[in-house]
Amino acid sequence: MRASRKGDALAQLLYNEGIRSQAVLNAIAGTPRESFLPDALKHKAYQNTALPIGQGQTISQPYIVAKMTELLLDSPNKPEKVLEIGTGSGYQTAILAQLFAKVFSVERIKTLQFQAKRRMNQLDLHNIAMKHGDGWKGWASKGPYDAIIVTAAAASLPQDLCDQLKEGGRLIIPVGNEQQSLLCIDRIEGELKTSTIESVRFVPLVAGELM
């Protein structure tokens, strides 16, 4: 996808905020964020802020999208197969699809999943498989995964997601209720090694499915 002036300006802002991966910055610059927003909010597409997309959900702040993606790219195992929990608008999905060979994405709200799938087709991104399902359970039949990224805050670490992570794999997940932390978890010799990245604010990771 070709970068726009607004996309370039957003990428520069994220660079100033500490994002250093040129691959991530290029993907952000070239992805039309307005395509993932309701008409009434399209004028805010290139602001570095989270925005509502309906169904009580949000499109994440571009900085946090870039930060989480950069953490995946920095994984020592050079991931190719990525699982995303919480498709939402599909914005994070589109960024991932430009940087990894295969992306699997699970969304519990059917309406959002349908809309996101349509956007992927419009953007000519075809290395993505989507599923309507319970994000807490992951997508075991397609695993294990080199990397897993979760775009909603879990009250505790979901065991099913840990079980679907390959040896040498990396899981990026916000954890907590009122106080949330972004965690980077690596599976090393069968053990999970956890690093806390920064404080964050996400919508909760809710169990179950919603039509």
Swiss-Prot record:
**What is its EC class?**
transferase
| Gene Ontology cellular-component terms listed | cytoplasm
Whose protein is this, by species? Alteromonas mediterranea (strain DSM 17117 / CIP 110805 / LMG 28347 / Deep ecotype)
What is this protein's record name? Answer: Protein-L-isoaspartate O-methyltransferase
Q: Which keywords does UniProt give here? A: Cytoplasm, Methyltransferase, S-adenosyl-L-methionine, Transferase
Q: Which SUPFAM superfamilies match?
A: S-adenosyl-L-methionine-dependent methyltransferases
State where it is primarily located: cytoplasm
Record keyword Transferase present: yes
**Which HAMAP family does this UniProt record tie to the protein?**
PIMT
Q: Which residues form the active site?
A: S60
A GO MF label: protein-L-isoaspartate (D-aspartate) O-methyltransferase activity
Q: What's its catalytic activity? A: [protein]-L-isoaspartate + S-adenosyl-L-methionine = [protein]-L-isoaspartate alpha-methyl ester + S-adenosyl-L-homocysteine
State the organism's lineage. Answer: Bacteria, Pseudomonadati, Pseudomonadota, Gammaproteobacteria, Alteromonadales
Query: In its keyword annotation, does this UniProt entry include S-adenosyl-L-methionine?
Result: yes
Q: Where, if anywhere, are coiled coils annotated? A: none
| Entry EC no(s) | 2.1.1.77
- Quote the PROSITE patterns the UniProt record gives: PCMT
Q: Provide one Gene Ontology biological process annotation.
A: protein modification process
- Provide the function of this protein: Catalyzes the methyl esterification of L-isoaspartyl residues in peptides and proteins that result from spontaneous decomposition of normal L-aspartyl and L-asparaginyl residues. It plays a role in the repair and/or degradation of damaged proteins.
